[in-house]
């Protein structure tokens, strides 16, 4: 996600998130663009940007503005084996990222949200069709699905049920 145009569908989906998530995870954060967008959208939230690449995380830390540095942190983590407790995050975001469905379901809190965005829609190399996202997430206790489009991008938002 190189610039704000690439964030359009992601930000549209963020606007649809009900409530004020206190803990947000941006998985596959790369240089932190989506994590910083979440921090701006939810000014009370603590945001964790996780990525396997220390080089990307170094860039994310470098570009984090001072006004967000106190509540945004970047950590090295493998999306297939996240080091966070079950139900830790009220919002989990993935921008142009391979979905690790079991781990997403595990770390998303009951009634929490998971947001997938693809900056070039179906042209994104790792794009996952909304039908597949819905099917995989329904099997893992999610409901209340919504699709978003803005520019070339697409986003998909799902809410986890209270009890799975």
Q: What are the residue ranges of the model-derived segments?
A:
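Class I SAM-dependent methyltransferase SAM/SAH-binding core
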Residues: 23-27, 31-81
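Core SAM-dependent methyltransferase catalytic element
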Residues: 149-164
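A short glycine-rich, Lys/Arg-flanked "PGG" loop and its adjoining helix->strand segment in the class I
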Residues: 101-113
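Conserved class I S-adenosyl-L-methionine
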Residues: 113-136
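Conserved alpha-helix/loop element of class I SAM-dependent methyltransferases that forms part
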Residues: 4-21
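A short acidic, Gly/Pro-enriched loop at the edge of an enzyme's catalytic core
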Residues: 80-92
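A short SAM/SAH-binding and catalytic strip from SAM-dependent methyltransferases
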Residues: 90-101
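A generic alpha-to-beta junction signature in SAM-dependent methyltransferases
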Residues: 17-18, 41, 108
């Amino acid at each position: 996600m190189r610039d704000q145009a690439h964030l359009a569908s992601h930000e549209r989906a963020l606007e649809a998130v009900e409530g004020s998530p206190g803990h947000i995870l941006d998985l596959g954060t790369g240089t932190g663009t989506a994590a910083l967008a979440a921090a701006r959208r939810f000014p009370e939230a603590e945001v964790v940007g996780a990525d396997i690449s220390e080089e990307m995380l170094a860039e994310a830390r470098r570009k984090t503005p001072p006004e967000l540095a106190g509540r945004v942190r970047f950590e090295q983590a493998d999306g297939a084996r996240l080091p966070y407790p079950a139900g830790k995050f009220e919002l989990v975001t993935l921008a142009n990222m391979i979905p690790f469905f079991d781990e997403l379901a595990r770390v998303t809190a009951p009634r929490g949200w998971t947001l997938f965005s693809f900056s070039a829609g179906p042209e994104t190399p790792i794009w996952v069709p909304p039908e597949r996202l819905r099917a995989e997430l329904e099997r893992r206790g999610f409901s209340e699905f919504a699709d978003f489009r803005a520019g070339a991008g697409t986003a998909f938002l799902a809410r986890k049920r209270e009890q799975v």
